[in-house]
Amino acid sequence: MATIKEIQQRLELVTELSDSFLEEVAKDQRSGVQKAVEKRKKAIQAELDEDLRLDQMIRYEKELYQSGYQAIAGIDEVGRGPLAGPVVAAAVILPPGCKIKGLNDSKKIPKKKHQEIYQAVMDKALAVGIGLMDSDIIDKVNIYEATKLAMKEALSKLPLKPDYLLIDAMKLDVEIPQESIIKGDANSLSIAAASIVAKVTRDRLMADYDKEFPGYAFAQNAGYGTKRHLEGLEHYGVSPIHRKTFEPVKSMLG
């Protein structure tokens, strides 16, 4: 009779719920074997669920590639709501049929996974472009217009020219066919890829700003109005990267 450890090692190689070995060892009444079988079944089911989720997330891209488009860029931004720092946009072109495990709306990805998934996107993408508009531009033109400018800059930085755009809840006045998708970062893998690239890029920038302007906890809050950030504003006043048209910064400046 095989040991529990031997069975566990063999189970690691099983990739289908219908595998005969899985059915065979399920009859083994030892509790260690039963636990190993259940664990493997759950892992296989999780893989199947993830593959199905990713299939759903590439449906826009799949239809467009089947229609003859050859370079589809997903575009998204991060940083519309913070009191400080830039708004950052990214444009990403993934290869046709590309699936990246764990890639989702960046707000749904655990923080500890951000770097890993960002790197997977950077490794697999055919092209990546990044655009940012700082607080001065945000104050000058408003956050909505600054977001569009950041997206257009990200688009212009792509080393490969896209022939179709999938954009998260926004339309751009550019001569490229496009679709605006509500909650795009949860429904299109290309937009989700742009979302995590923009998120990690902005978080790194804010961590750098934290060293330049200590006291606001920018490395932790990325410029959002947390308790520590607001306390920093009260104590140190307004920094050069604060958005002067955003409350409570605006009121502090009189």
Swiss-Prot record:
It comes from the Bacteria. Residues 70-254 form the RNase H type-2 domain. GO terms for molecular function: manganese ion binding; RNA binding; RNA-DNA hybrid ribonuclease activity. Its main location: cytoplasm. Its EC number is 3.1.26.4. It is found in: Cytoplasm. InterPro entries: RNase_HII, RNase_HII/HIII, RNase_HII/HIII_dom, RNaseH-like_sf, RNaseH_sf. It catalyses: Endonucleolytic cleavage to 5'-phosphomonoester. Its cofactor is Mn(2+); Mg(2+). GO terms for cellular component: cytoplasm; ribonuclease H2 complex. A divalent metal cation binds at D76, E77, D168. Transmembrane segments: none annotated. Keywords: Cytoplasm, Endonuclease, Hydrolase, Manganese, Metal-binding, Nuclease. Endonuclease that specifically degrades the RNA of RNA-DNA hybrids. This is Ribonuclease HII. It comes from Streptococcus gordonii (strain Challis / ATCC 35105 / BCRC 15272 / CH1 / DL1 / V288). The gene is rnhB.
